[in-house]
Amino acid sequence: MFLYNITLQRATGISHAIHGNFSGTKQQEIVVSRGKILELLRPDANTGKVHTLLTMEVFGVVRSLMAFRLTGGTKDYVVVGSDSGRIVILEYHPSKNMFEKIHQETFGKSGCRRIVPGQFLAVDPKGRAVMIGATEKQKLVYILNRDAAARLTISSPLEAHKANTLVYHVVGVDVGFENPMFACLEMDYEEADNDPTGEAAANTQQTLTFYELDLGLNHVVRKYSEALEEHGNFLITVPGGSDGPSGVLICSENYITYKNFGDQPDIRCPIPRRRNDLDDPERGMIFVCSATHKTKSMFFFLAQTEQGDIFKVTLETDEEMVTEIRMKYFDTIPVATAMCVLKTGFLFVSSEFGNHYLYQIAHLGDDDEEPEFSSAMPLEEGDTFFFQPRPLKNLVLVDEQESLSPIMSCQIADLANEDTPQLYVACGRGPRSTLRVLRHGLEVSEMAVSELPGNPNAVWTVRRHVEDEFDAYIIVSFVNATLVLSIGETVEEVTDSGFLGTTPTLSCSLLGEDALVQVYPDGIRHIRADKRVNEWKTPGKKTIIRCAVNQRQVVIALTGGELVYFEMDPSGQLNEYTERKEMSADVVCMSLANVPPGEQRSRFLAVGLVDNTVRIISLDPSDCLQPLSMQALPAQPESLCIVEMGGVEKQDELGEKGTIGFLYLNIGLQNGVLLRTVLDPVTGDLSDTRTRYLGSRPVKLFRVRMQGQEAVLAMSSRSWLSYSYQSRFHLTPLSYETLEYASGFASEQCPEGIVAISTNTLRILALEKLGAVFNQVAFPLQYTPRKFVIHPETNNLILIETDHNAYTEATKAQRKQQMAEEMVEAAGEDERELAAEMAAAFLNENLPEAIFGAPKAGSGQWASLVRLINPIQGNTLDLVQLEQNEAAFSVAICRFLNGGDDWYVLVGVARDMILNPRSVGGGYIYTYRIVGGGDKLEFLHKTPVEDVPLAIAPFQGRVLVGVGKLLRIYDLGKKKLLRKCENKHVPNLVTGIHTIGQRVIVSDVQESLFWVRYRRNENQLIIFADDTYPRWITTACLLDYDTMASADKFGNICVVRLPPNTSDDVDEDPTGNKALWDRGLLNGASQKAEIIINYHIGETVLSLQKTTLIPGGSESLVYTTLSGGIGILVPFTSHEDHDFFQHLEMHMRSEFPPLCGRDHLSFRSYYFPVKNVIDGDLCEQFNSMDPHKQKSVSEELDRTPPEVSKKLEDIRTRYAF
């Protein structure tokens, strides 16, 4: 078996985010890392939308990111610390839309190791040096400079190592143009290591150490070190030089402290706490991330606590000495991994879990209503300030980037009966959790819908003048009339446009600079800007049946297949070409390309005929109306559309930006198939045809504009958009009802929209999320979803949600009541009334937990519930709240042989579980019956068990339960489940159970898979085979009777198969005792599984499923990851394909090595050598290589670049999208 890995949706969780002017213009961009992916985002200052410019797989783990700019430069570079053992500096090239590696310096081994630098990066604010540090011992400093040609240079590394030292954070100190300085939070563990009593470990203090790079001596010295009172978790650089006082802010538990060397005394301020918080009062509070905003006159910091509250931190200075720290509550947003304040007044927030946000900073929080806290205010030691959280006041949400991270569980099924299966994804953490339904398709925003007086058959938009940015008219054609609507604040009918209203229209367009042309069955109407009208009438009884128009040309087909060609002369007159062309058959459809910039005409006309052919005809004056090429089609054509796509940005001599792309002829057939063919711009030859089936109706094609480039809207029984995005072609269905006709639409509110008709309505639509694979509907949940099952009869989902360190609703209400009573009791006689009012206000206050976070209850506190939900409407049908400290870990739906036709839901629950060191107060299996037509859970009984039931699976009319490390069979009883059989030989903890026939496959938490046979006659469960590697399994999936796919905690997927000679029926030994006892526990079972597939995904996989994703497609193995990625592994069907992709992968490894310097082969073999899997992500980077590199690689494979691209596209569309 050989598999090919395709990513359908890249990871959506963000681990790092930095901002800067990476493209060298004034506009600020954001670079984010999503684990093994680098992405460049550009927030649009006008619309507030975040656009993705570039996404690149780096085939390595991005551990740290920093932006820097050389002194006096205008462009920011990106420094990346990764697991490659190399420091890499990247530059973004807007013309190629690529990151280019400028420097790559090797300093250590690959992998995420303790003493290999890469975990921490710090840059001198003036861009003169960069420090890269490991978590322990090693720190290296590189000097950055320019050479004579103004190119960036990098020095050899200077060491700043210190043995036996742990590093917590590193920043560059802003010292102006003095010698560059770096500040580190360190801890020396040498004494603690050598002291057996443990006293030294208890007394170890963290130190703040300053390292100075002496540029004159080319040497790093430890300038100064100071022990800290509190344990710090991160540092913030304070602007220095002419901008501020320099120094650092140390964020530690409950305090923020300003330090600088010299005479500066330490200034420290407690971190304010929420008033009347339900959290454990003993729990400290820390800042988790921060952002700095600096202008010429002032600077401030936004720092966020672990509850999500943001404080604005400012420093008061007196003669360059800092005198106080001031803090003011700013707003509360979900906890972030990184925040970026942009110069345009936006705040970009990459959330730890869930969606990412872009906020507009509406106010700087300078009003006096909000109390300001200061380090100068007198407080007792250990006391702090209190504030009242409130909804957003200073920030305004302007855009949201959907993120599935973390995906806890996923199932693929067609529960909505839509032909194409949907992905039901349980994702998120705590109160921000959601159940999302993903459908393949582009999300459509409906801008406007209006009724029309009848059923129109076509719609167009035209501009008044070629220079106009927006459209002026919408023309709607009916069977016997034409309606003209003007576009303004509202859409209104106009009568003086010059269009003939008493006839249907075949086509209309802007002609030349400012004239309009209307083609109708009896002639052509040329409307000049001063409303003069020229008309050309059809000769005799003939009528126009088809036409094609662009800015300068009109071609019409008369009855009988006669073509007449018109072209505009320099004076703006429309002239008929002297000859006419008789076609051999009736014309069904025609298309002209847009006139290329700087040219007189479009050279080619495409004509589709009844005889199942499409012909390319020249419009060049030298051979006008001469046939150039022809293509036979499998069915009759319905429509044609010539577009220029896949362009690269180029600047001409005048500095005008334009795109140079390829001409494609799109052919829509009557049998619902779309063909895309390359049209040679010189000879007019047709080559490299790609085919896709779109739907059951004939395909109509319309040219629209998307992101400044031409795209094609194809309409069949479903509408599809074909567009080029990040150097790849996408053909994506629209998640919208069937449309009949469309045209591009540009107005002030909607610059790249679509106007379309559906029955008797006119709709204006916008497609904003280009590049998105899925559109999603989200339903909120209360706690972190763990697992869910589908009720087969009603298609409802039974979902278990469990949170650690959380209170149940009942406990929260009880705690609130208790705190309110304490408030009243603590007040004196005269303040009783006021205290009672405050207590009542506190009880009524309801801050949504999805924004403000849930209270942290402390370790060993659990909250859990079972939810019955309708996945289509998203309404909760039934909800069972479990008691405080009961945690649901497994769920199954089954029928019992002795339980009739009823469906039962079994939920495995642990009581008083402590995670570390692991201990359990006991477990239960709750049994519910599904009643009320499938929308109610009726509690039957609970069965006590001695450990956590982490896995439950139905088995031959009974259930298999993994209780701790015991595998048991239970049957349904009146008062509880009855134990029937048990196996004690699983080493650690049963985490999953799969059954097929008499076989049971059990996954252990750290010892991979065990194959178990149930012997009915002896009532025994016997382990007869296991795996040779100790895998830490997270999820597994049956592929066939002998084959299992599984994924582990470290991001690997493997497929293991029992060898053909494996016997699970121990024939020679009728009692089965030999298999039970004839084995040492250390060597496991007597038979071993073979490894067929090993592959490192790079993200922890939490769900695997064998399924088909498209109607009529082949089966693939679909996986989802903790970071929000979705991918598939697809089998090769022929040796020839496998051989081709194996060679392509080999060439890509050498020709296009990964960005961060990690070796691709060793990345995919991180824990186990990669076996029998080809990396489609690497192969698909072929499309984004330089054309000459593409040519050399494809020549090595004895093919042309279009053939290689076609192979890549074909294998993708055969299984997915």
Curated annotation (Swiss-Prot):
It comes from the Eukaryota. Signal peptide: none annotated. Keywords: mRNA processing, mRNA splicing, Nucleus, Spliceosome. It is found in: Nucleus. It holds the Pfam family CPSF_A. GO terms for biological process: mRNA splicing, via spliceosome. One of its GO terms (molecular function) is U2 snRNA binding. SUPFAM superfamilies: WD40 repeat-like. GO terms for cellular component: nucleus; U2 snRNP; U2-type precatalytic spliceosome; U2-type spliceosomal complex. PANTHER family: DNA REPAIR/RNA PROCESSING CPSF FAMILY. Component of the 17S U2 SnRNP complex, a ribonucleoprotein complex that contains small nuclear RNA (snRNA) U2 and a number of specific proteins. Part of the SF3B subcomplex of the 17S U2 SnRNP complex. SF3B associates with the splicing subcomplex SF3A and a 12S RNA unit to form the U2 small nuclear ribonucleoproteins complex (U2 snRNP). Component of the minor (U12-type spliceosome) spliceosome. Belongs to the RSE1 family. The core of the protein consists of three beta-propeller domains. Component of the 17S U2 SnRNP complex of the spliceosome, a large ribonucleoprotein complex that removes introns from transcribed pre-mRNAs. The 17S U2 SnRNP complex (1) directly participates in early spliceosome assembly and (2) mediates recognition of the intron branch site during pre-mRNA splicing by promoting the selection of the pre-mRNA branch-site adenosine, the nucleophile for the first step of splicing. This is Splicing factor 3B subunit 3. It comes from Danio rerio. The gene is sf3b3.
